[in-house]
Amino acid sequence: MISEEKEYRPCVGIMLFNKQGNIFIGKRFDSDSYWQMPQGGVDEGEELEQAALRELLEEVGTDEAEVVAQNKEWIYYNLPEEVIPICWNGRYSGQKQRWFLMKFCGKDKDININYTDHPEFKEWRWQNVDDLVASAIPFKKEVYKKVIEEFSSIIKGSIYDS
């Protein structure tokens, strides 16, 4: 349940799909078990789409993508209680996210997860959308279900030839 008294960090998420309809996911440095789609905070005064494109470049190391859709409403999730004190100095109890569906227009060699000095991911792969939730960290599974529900028909209608 979402409490009006708690503060949620504004964030964007990116569901990047390739020409086969598979989704980009990365394995974070702080996890050996879970994979996630790129996401990150929105800077003060930054437009949501601008933030999504910046996060794509920072985390995936590419700008070879075009925005296809944006979800309609904020999606909220709470961090586990034990994680709150170590994330963002305990300021937020979770995140509120707006998600962007992006079509990858490049080749795999155009992806560089080591683009920044502090990469988010140690590995990456293309994941079938049907298996996406199973690879996610438990507290993000409901978010991923909502994102898939909103975007999967668009992805299926957008699979393109090489």
From Swiss-Prot:
It comes from the Bacteria. Residues 7-149 form the Nudix hydrolase domain. A motif (Nudix box) lies at residues 40-61. Its cofactor is a divalent metal cation. SUPFAM superfamilies: Nudix. GO terms for biological process: nucleoside phosphate metabolic process; ribose phosphate metabolic process. Belongs to the Nudix hydrolase family. RppH subfamily. Keywords: Hydrolase. Pfam families: NUDIX. This is RNA pyrophosphohydrolase. It is an enzyme of class 3 (hydrolase). Accelerates the degradation of transcripts by removing pyrophosphate from the 5'-end of triphosphorylated RNA, leading to a more labile monophosphorylated state that can stimulate subsequent ribonuclease cleavage. Gene3D superfamilies: Nucleoside Triphosphate Pyrophosphohydrolase. GO terms for molecular function: bis(5'-adenosyl)-pentaphosphatase activity; guanosine-3',5'-bis(diphosphate) 3'-diphosphatase activity. Its EC number is 3.6.1.-.
